[in-house]
Every structure is written in C-alpha cells, then in structure tokens.
C-alpha cells in the first residue's frame, strides 16, 4: 500500500508541469527560508545556464532525459535517477530530450 501511494504521488508530480515547445516551465510547490521545492519541465534543448546556489540542491528526474553539469563534469539523468548539486559549486541543467525534474534546495 505504501508503495502504491508513493507511486501515485510520483505520477501526480509528473503531471503538474506540462511540456511547452522552446520553454522551461516551473511550478513552486513550497518555499521558505530553509527549503525550496520546485517542479520543472524542459523542452528538448532548453537549459538553465551555469550558476551556483546558496543551498544543497537535490534533483530527481521524473520523466525524459536531462543532463546536469557540476563543476564541469556532465551527468545524464533518466526517470527515477537523482543527483545532488552541492552548495557553492557551479552547475547547469540541460534537456537532452524532454525532461521533467523535481528540485529540492535546502539552505
């Protein structure tokens, strides 16, 4: 039962942000001084350029194929895979294909 409930939440998250040609779409689920939780959808070829964050960022791929670059090293993410982008380290996110992700930043 717990697995089924988790699966339902995961499916609903994927449906919260639609793909739009040539765009990155985001939806903030929660934000305060300690944490930020945001859903993103990337059209193929769209990118959030290199920047650094003041908090540790945890990314989970919800759909598609994305590429995360951290300190110049590239990592490919597919559905269900996650990665941590450490605070203060330069990173970028790119939609190799259409790509949806959940971003949790802890400050």
What residues fall within each predicted segment?
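A cytosolic small-molecule/anion-sensing beta-strand core signal
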Residues: 62-63, 78-79, 97
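Short acidic-glycine-tyrosine-enriched beta hairpin
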Residues: 72-87
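Single conserved hydrophobic/aromatic residue that forms the stacking wall/gate
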Residues: 1-6, 10
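Short, conserved beta-strand element in jelly-roll/cupin
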Residues: 41, 54-68
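A short glycine-rich, His/Asp/Glu-containing loop-to-beta-strand
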Residues: 15-46, 104-107
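Ligand-binding loop in jelly-roll beta-barrel domains
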Residues: 87-107
